[in-house]
Amino acid sequence: MELTSDGNAIYREEPDEEDPWAFTLRPRETKVIFELVKKLDGLRRPIRNDRKVAFTGDKILRYDSGNGQREEAAYVYTEEPDAKTLESWFLRMAESANHLFELERVVRFDRLGVNKTLLYFQTSFDKNRVVASHHFLPVLRKVAGDQRFVHIARARAAALIERIESE
């Protein structure tokens, strides 16, 4: 995941992925993320906690300030609240990308699965786990306006469109 200070982001499943998801965060979302980085002194402050916990993989945060300074923080577990919040933001971005990929897939290949996928997306949306929600509007409009999808999926898509547009 790469994020620039103007809110442009790129999500890749693999480092050499040919077609990553490029998206733009809303200004308020971008501001929150970069304020967290600032609170962590540009990732210079130690955030690693050596408490024995299950190994779930290294989490690596990198910050390039643009003036040649590059900081990196690698950890498995942290108790630093700002680092946890920052990690949560990146997990939310990945979760949002996965929702969009799955929704686009079922719209194209599994019309009967659209309502279930929309329900999962709506659950994440209700729990404030979705970022860059405006990127979902084209596929939601496609579902809401296409009679080939079941009525409940069209109604759910229309309700989600209304909620996203009112944000």
Language-model segments: residues:
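Short amphipathic beta-strand/extended segments with alternating polar/hydrophobic composition
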Residues: 1-5, 21-25, 68-79
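A short, structured beta-strand/loop element
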Residues: 2-11, 55-59
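A mature extracytoplasmic/lumenal domain signature
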Residues: 5-7, 15, 29, 37, ...
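Acidic/histidine-rich, surface-exposed loop or edge segments in extracytoplasmic proteins
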Residues: 8-21, 121-123, 138-139
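Short C-terminal domain-edge/linker segments immediately following a structured domain
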Residues: 16-20, 33, 92-95
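Generic alpha-helical scaffold signal
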Residues: 24-27, 55
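Charged, amphipathic alpha-helical segments
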Residues: 27-50
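Short, well-ordered, aromatic-rich surface patches in folded extracellular/luminal domains
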Residues: 46-167
